């Protein structure tokens, strides 16, 4: 797999540990807004359900950034029966604190340093620009990447092929020289696959690296190369 020149990484939960950082940022908001920490686990569970559903709508252009930001905490507060807190203010505090978190996915720094010496590394991420760039800067990741492509700026969130095509064109990268690495099968892998780019699926939570029947069906319909890894350090023998 050493014929590649450009490696495109997803950010959240591929190299920047979104799950833990999101949790830490939201927990930090609780005392500021007078929320009991005993409510946190249930609040976080409900919030994630609403947030995931709203982000799916956003990816399909079914909701605006402003409505997503406003609704995810208002819906959570309402379901929890909590009054007297403005969901927009809570959202702003959360967005201010989250990009300051610095937890990385295990092995991220270990693989990025040697990969950056051999390849041009780039980011393709869904998210809000004011947050994603700060994540990269505060975590020390920014130094490894030549280009960063944020869906909000391009107005085409993954898995839309437009964001992948835009990245290739901007980087002057050919499809056969490019590889997408990400944790989401639907967003990163199928998105890159449909854009004609090879992919590596980072799936640390799966019991093994085998593909499901539905995934194999997708692979058979496409001519790109797909691999699955369970540790970021598995990239080293594949790419170095």
Predicted regions and their residues:
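Asp-based, Mg2+/Mn2+-dependent phosphohydrolase catalytic module
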Residues: 1-7, 113, 124, 128-240
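Catalytic-core regions built around general acid/base machinery
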Residues: 107-118
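A short alpha-helix capping/helix-coil boundary motif
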Residues: 50-54, 88-92, 110-112, 143-146, ...
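Short, conserved clusters of charged catalytic residues that mark active-site
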Residues: 106-107, 162
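N-terminal helical cap/lid subdomain that shapes the substrate entry/recognition surface
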Residues: 2-11, 15-106
């Amino acid at each position: 797999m050493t014929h590649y020149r450009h490696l495109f990484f997803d950010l959240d939960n591929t190299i920047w540990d979104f799950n833990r950082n999101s949790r830490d940022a939201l927990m930090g908001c609780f005392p500021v807004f007078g929320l009991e920490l005993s409510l946190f686990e249930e609040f976080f569970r409900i919030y994630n359900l609403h947030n995931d559903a709203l982000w799916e709508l956003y990816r399909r252009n079914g909701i605006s950034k402003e409505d997503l930001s406003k609704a995810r905490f208002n819906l959570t507060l309402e379901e929890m029966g909590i009054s007297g807190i403005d969901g927009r203010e809570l959202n702003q505090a959360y967005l201010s604190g989250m990009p300051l978190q610095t937890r990385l996915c295990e092995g991220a720094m270990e693989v990025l340093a040697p990969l950056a010496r051999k390849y041009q590394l780039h980011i393709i991420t869904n998210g809000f620009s004011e947050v994603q760039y700060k994540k990269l800067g505060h975590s020390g990741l920014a130094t490894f990447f030549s280009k960063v492509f944020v869906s909000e700026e391009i107005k085409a969130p993954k898995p839309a092929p437009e964001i992948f095509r835009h990245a290739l064109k901007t980087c002057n990268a050919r499809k056969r020289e490019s590889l997408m690495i990400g944790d989401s099968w639907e967003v990163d892998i199928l998105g890159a696959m449909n854009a004609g780019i090879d992919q590596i699926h980072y799936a640390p939570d799966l019991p093994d690296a085998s593909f499901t029947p539905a995934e194999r069906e997708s692979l058979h319909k496409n001519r790109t190369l797909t691999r699955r890894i369970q540790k970021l350090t598995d990239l080293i023998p594949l790419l170095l």
